[in-house]
């Protein structure tokens, strides 16, 4: 496993993340790629992307039931990436995403 690359100094999570399995698409540099989200919160996500996603990439993440969400990759190690949404999800949006994940 490679070394974690971080866009900024690590700080503890302020929001709990829920475990999910959502196969979807992430787009960066105008290139859509497959990604499997493995956890999700109102502020961000962690996923596995076979192609990898460069640190600090501006991304659009297609969340079933919500459509595309804009954000930025905050850390990356191998195929795993973590990102933060530009605009946090509200409770109703997070509930919709969770319902889609377990439908």
Tell where the protein language model's regions lie, with residue ranges.
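Structured alpha-helical
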Residues: 1-103
């Amino acid at each position: 496993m490679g070394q974690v690359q971080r866009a900024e100094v690590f700080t503890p999570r302020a929001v709990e993340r829920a475990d999910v399995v959502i196969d979807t698409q992430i787009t960066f540099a105008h290139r859509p790629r497959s990604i499997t989200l493995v956890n999700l919160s109102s502020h961000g996500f962690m996923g596995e992307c076979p192609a990898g996603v460069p640190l600090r990439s501006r991304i659009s993440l297609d969340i079933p039931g919500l459509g595309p969400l804009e954000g930025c990759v905050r850390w990356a190690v191998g195929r795993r990436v973590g990102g933060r949404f530009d605009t946090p999800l509200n409770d109703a949006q997070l509930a919709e995403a969770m319902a889609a994940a377990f439908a």
